[in-house]
């Protein structure tokens, strides 16, 4: 939803994203499923409106989690900061509802945009490397702390290998 996730990261690391609701006047669309980026910008041009967004409801999270997990699975669910959206709160409510089916660990990223994408990518890389859920959560919390506090002395601890498809800043 609110993560700026490079398309190749989503595919390469198998990252699932719950769509946010995009509202153009009275019409609502699910990001990515009912409205892709091209369609979004086309609607902005045609309607001359700035759309609004609405976080997924707890029910939408329950359905989403059930669509990507099986009984007994653990889901690490990283979200836009609760200071900007109710998404994290919806995820927490859904996690509580599903506690007898599987474990959902909602994380408030304390940021948005590319920071969330980075956390998701690193979590998947660690999972593929055989790290435990606790190790992954601890590492993501470390990235969150660096990104939210902005401590320049810790910047070298953030893994920022960018894909080759991005233009050079030189």
Whereabouts are the PLM-identified features?
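Internal, active-site/partner-interface "lid" segment
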Residues: 125-170
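Short Gly/Thr/Asp-enriched flexible loops that form oxyanion-binding sites at enzyme active sites
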Residues: 79-99, 118-121
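Short glycine-rich or small-residue beta-strand-to-loop segments that form or flank ligand, phosphate
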Residues: 74-81, 105-108, 122
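Short, ordered loop/turn segments at secondary-structure junctions
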Residues: 1-2, 22, 80, 109-112
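Glycine-rich phosphate/diphosphate-binding loops that line cofactor/substrate pockets in enzymes
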Residues: 62-73
